[in-house]
Amino acid sequence: MDARELIDKYHMNTYSRFPVTLVPGEGARVWDDEGNEYIDLVAGIAVNVLGHCHPAVVEAVKEQVERLIHCSNLYYNEPQAEAARLLAEAAPKDLNKVFFCNSGTESVECAIKLARKFTGCTKFIAFEGGFHGRTMGALSATWKPEFREPFEPLVPEFEHVPYGDVNAVEKAIDDDTAAVIVEPVQGEAGVRIPPEGFLRELRELCDEHGLLLIVDEVQSGMGRTGQFFAFEHEDVLPDIVCLAKGLGGGVPVGATIAREEVAEAFEPGDHGSTFGGNPLACAAVCAAVSTVLEENLPEAAERKGKLAMRILSEAEDVVEEVRGRGLMMGVEVGDDERAKDVAREMLDRGALVNVTSGDVIRLVPPLVIGEDELEKALAELADALRASG
């Protein structure tokens, strides 16, 4: 039996997969078990910001795996110390306390607990279209009914309002509201960018009412949108930030970053993770964060994003909308089946893309993708869109 047959037989039926088994990868390219080569515009769903098997991450993991893989948080470990320092220094001033976990949804769970503990309140305001994870707390903040309804009742007191509508947020605030949780760019909803000034207005509103502002940077962080954090486009300081995906350069890891005043609400025993902050994952964090900063990959993402939008504009007449920020882009085609057909067609054309929100082709390539690779893959996508239109 091959990998596909084994997974179909033994793995729970939780994923809709393309009929491709990926084996090796390097940079922005991957190969399947039949030797076919693909330019990767999915990057493990925005995880591989440094591409596949980046030498800095590979070397850091190799070195650490021979030294100390895991020791729990009963003890201090050096990679965790260095990773926390790097993140605190990469974040804007006052965001200087870090909690490490293993995934994006865990980082959101931490943020929810911390906001409750700090404020003493239990209500959260989230947004229509928002996606924050699939564990029970993060799922409560998530909007999509298909994700939520099979598992209700969820955590109570999460109210969803239209994305980008500050007036709706203000109307939803009551005396028991702890925080507003928001994505600076909604990824799962089809790469939706809020109106300019939205985050600033949210910050002002939270300050006015004594609420915390939680910004979910799980998909948009690590330089993807042209800044290390997407909220930096509006020069806003959140109280809590959720980070994962690209944080480990492909190694599973998440982090919750908070202002010191807020973080001090936690005491030993309030929250924890057996694997969170383990030496192996944190060695990868050190390599990934250092590389993103030293190679100025946010600037590269902004530059390549502009190139991508120019190429995709050639297909604007056969789609509903092309939108994006940096290397986080969405092509809304207006028809669910057409979007799926184009994604499958792209396999034959030698590129990986994925579909989100039904009819949006999401493009989140590695930040290190070569401009020639980007041009080649997007030219094929533009051609496939025209052919399907």
UniProtKB/Swiss-Prot annotation:
GO terms for cellular component: cytoplasm. Belongs to the class-III pyridoxal-phosphate-dependent aminotransferase family. ArgD subfamily. Pyridoxal 5'-phosphate binds at residues 104-105, 131, 216-219, 274. Pfam families: Aminotran_3 (PF00202). One of its GO terms (molecular function) is N2-acetyl-L-ornithine:2-oxoglutarate 5-aminotransferase activity. The modification N6-(pyridoxal phosphate)lysine is found at residue 245. GO terms for biological process: L-arginine biosynthetic process. Its main location: cytoplasm. Homodimer. InterPro entries: AcOrn/SuccOrn_fam, Aminotrans_3, Aminotrans_3_PPA_site, Class-III_PLP-dep_AT, PyrdxlP-dep_Trfase, PyrdxlP-dep_Trfase_major, PyrdxlP-dep_Trfase_small. It is found in: Cytoplasm. May also have succinyldiaminopimelate aminotransferase activity, thus carrying out the corresponding step in lysine biosynthesis. N(2)-acetyl-L-ornithine binds at residues 134, 273. Its cofactor is pyridoxal 5'-phosphate. This is Acetylornithine aminotransferase. Binds 1 pyridoxal phosphate per subunit. Keywords: Amino-acid biosynthesis, Aminotransferase, Arginine biosynthesis, Cytoplasm, Pyridoxal phosphate, Transferase. Its EC number is 2.6.1.11. It is an enzyme of class 2 (transferase).
